[in-house]
């Protein structure tokens, strides 16, 4: 068969130290946090100045907690609540995968609100700066999914230029490499769009605009990418033939658009007051 490749059976563990091991999945999270921290230190000092470097350093631990707790709780509540009620001892096994981006996003949003309230920072502007580096983590996370041979795609038509057989799927049917498609849409493309937008001082000056772009952009990217991804076997297709990922992402498009509208409205109102 032309344009068909076999998933190369990567070892999900990068390095072993006796009883300890570093998984690619964990490495993706750590790398994303470090790169995001570095980028955010630069973003918060660009006009209008939002926070200090020290506050960004301090927030890193809050963001980590929000991602891990929110991501895990989101996966449990959105995807497998019944399973984890019967297997409470598996609740903490994050090294085996099972993290929800939507849950992680909510966890970080809560962390932003609490941290900004404690330190007198505008949460809208701070959230804008947090939003820009997030696609880095999405990109690396999807690459880790590919390395783990999980979240494979739906059967792909013969004309698709890069089909892949996943032995772990239990069949030799060529599929979409959905992890790589998601890495491209949710990660690479969204990051480029946000990075370019963040260079525009007019956009940066509208609190909530960049955050709205991220929320709406992710909603569009994830909803589109889910069309190539095989639904979770324990959920399948849900109402209207949509997947859980799509049901969680479609509202994000509306929420993100509303955030952008609000940002423009607030900016116009502040401009009118300044000239009054």
From Swiss-Prot:
It is found in: Cell inner membrane. The keyword Amino-acid biosynthesis does not apply. Its EC number is 2.5.1.145. The chain crosses the membrane at residues 17-37, 59-79, 94-114, 132-152, 177-197, 208-225, 235-255. One of its GO terms (biological process) is lipoprotein biosynthetic process. Signal peptide: none annotated. One of its GO terms (molecular function) is phosphatidylglycerol-prolipoprotein diacylglyceryl transferase activity. A 1,2-diacyl-sn-glycero-3-phospho-(1'-sn-glycerol) binds at residue 142. GO terms for cellular component: plasma membrane. Disulfide bonds: none annotated. Keywords: Cell inner membrane, Cell membrane, Membrane, Transferase, Transmembrane, Transmembrane helix. It is an enzyme of class 2 (transferase). Pfam families: LGT. Pathway: Protein modification; lipoprotein biosynthesis (diacylglyceryl transfer). It comes from the Bacteria. It is a multi-pass membrane protein. NCBIfam families: lgt (TIGR00544). Belongs to the Lgt family. Catalyzes the transfer of the diacylglyceryl group from phosphatidylglycerol to the sulfhydryl group of the N-terminal cysteine of a prolipoprotein, the first step in the formation of mature lipoproteins. This is Phosphatidylglycerol--prolipoprotein diacylglyceryl transferase.
């Amino acid at each position: 068969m032309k344009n068909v490749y076999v998933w190369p059976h990567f070892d999900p563990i990068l390095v072993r130290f006796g009883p300890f091991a570093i998984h690619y999945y964990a490495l993706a999270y750590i790398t994303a946090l470090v790169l995001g921290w570095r980028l955010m230190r630069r973003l918060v000092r660009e006009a209008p100045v939002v926070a200090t470097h020290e506050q960004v350093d301090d927030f890193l631990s809050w963001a980590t907690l929000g991602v891990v707790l929110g991501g895990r709780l989101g996966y449990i509540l959105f995807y497998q609540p019944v399973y984890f009620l019967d297997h409470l001892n598996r609740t903490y096994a994050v090294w085996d995968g099972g993290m929800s981006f939507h849950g992680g996003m909510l966890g970080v949003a809560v962390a932003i609100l609490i941290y900004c309230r404690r330190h007198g920072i505008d949460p809208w502007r701070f959230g804008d700066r947090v939003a820009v580096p997030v696609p880095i983590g999405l990109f690396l996370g999807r690459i880790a999914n590919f390395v783990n041979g999980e979240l494979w795609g739906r059967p792909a038509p013969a004309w698709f230029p890069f089909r892949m057989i996943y032995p772990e799927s239990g069949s030799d049917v060529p599929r979409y490499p959905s992890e790589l498609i998601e890495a491209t849409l949710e990660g690479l493309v969204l990051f480029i769009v946000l990075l370019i937008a963040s260079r525009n001082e007019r956009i940066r000056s509208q609190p909530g605009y960049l955050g709205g772009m991220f929320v709406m952009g992710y909603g569009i990217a994830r909803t589109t990418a889910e069309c190539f991804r095989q639904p979770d076997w324990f959920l399948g297709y849900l109402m209207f033939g949509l997947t859980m990922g799509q049901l969680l992402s479609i509202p994000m498009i509306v929420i993100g658009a509303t955030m952008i509208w609000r940002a423009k409205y607030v900016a116009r109102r502040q401009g009118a007051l300044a000239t009054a």
